[in-house]
Amino acid sequence: MSSPTIPSRLYSLLFRRTSTFALTIAVGALFFERAFDQGADAIYEHINEGKLWKHIKHKYENKE
């Protein structure tokens, strides 16, 4: 008897039952959203370096 391959193992663990399939999709969407959002923010901040308020506010704050 041969050992199960990776795709068949994934199918049996994550996609065979509807409940685990839905949970897999929801968790995948959550992680994708977080990664995409952080990546987009990093790119935006890199492109606008020195133009955003958090980069220049030290010039305008009162030092007491």
Swiss-Prot record:
<dbReference type="InterPro" id="IPR036656">
    <property type="entry name" value="QCR9_sf"/>
</dbReference>
<keyword id="KW-0812">Transmembrane</keyword>
<keyword id="KW-0472">Membrane</keyword>
<dbReference type="GO" id="GO:0005743">
    <property type="term" value="C:mitochondrial inner membrane"/>
</dbReference>
<protein>
    <recommendedName>
        <fullName>Cytochrome b-c1 complex subunit 9</fullName>
    </recommendedName>
</protein>
<keyword id="KW-1133">Transmembrane helix</keyword>
<keyword id="KW-0679">Respiratory chain</keyword>
<dbReference type="InterPro" id="IPR008027">
    <property type="entry name" value="QCR9"/>
</dbReference>
<keyword id="KW-0496">Mitochondrion</keyword>
<feature type="topological domain" description="Mitochondrial intermembrane">
    <location>
        <begin position="44"/>
        <end position="63"/>
    </location>
</feature>
<feature type="topological domain" description="Mitochondrial matrix">
    <location>
        <begin position="2"/>
        <end position="18"/>
    </location>
</feature>
<dbReference type="GO" id="GO:0005739">
    <property type="term" value="C:mitochondrion"/>
</dbReference>
<dbReference type="GO" id="GO:0045333">
    <property type="term" value="P:cellular respiration"/>
</dbReference>
<keyword id="KW-0999">Mitochondrion inner membrane</keyword>
<keyword id="KW-0813">Transport</keyword>
<dbReference type="GO" id="GO:0045275">
    <property type="term" value="C:respiratory chain complex III"/>
</dbReference>
<comment type="similarity">
    <text>Belongs to the UQCR10/QCR9 family.</text>
</comment>
<feature type="transmembrane region" description="Helical">
    <location>
        <begin position="19"/>
        <end position="43"/>
    </location>
</feature>
<comment type="function">
    <text>Component of the ubiquinol-cytochrome c oxidoreductase, a multisubunit transmembrane complex that is part of the mitochondrial electron transport chain which drives oxidative phosphorylation.</text>
</comment>
<dbReference type="GO" id="GO:0006122">
    <property type="term" value="P:mitochondrial electron transport, ubiquinol to cytochrome c"/>
</dbReference>
<keyword id="KW-0249">Electron transport</keyword>
<comment type="subunit">
    <text>Component of the ubiquinol-cytochrome c oxidoreductase (cytochrome b-c1 complex, complex III, CIII), a multisubunit enzyme composed of 11 subunits. The complex is composed of 3 respiratory subunits cytochrome b, cytochrome c1 and Rieske protein UQCRFS1, 2 core protein subunits UQCRC1/QCR1 and UQCRC2/QCR2, and 6 low-molecular weight protein subunits UQCRH/QCR6, UQCRB/QCR7, UQCRQ/QCR8, UQCR10/QCR9, UQCR11/QCR10 and subunit 9, the cleavage product of Rieske protein UQCRFS1.</text>
</comment>
<dbReference type="Pfam" id="PF05365">
    <property type="entry name" value="UCR_UQCRX_QCR9"/>
</dbReference>
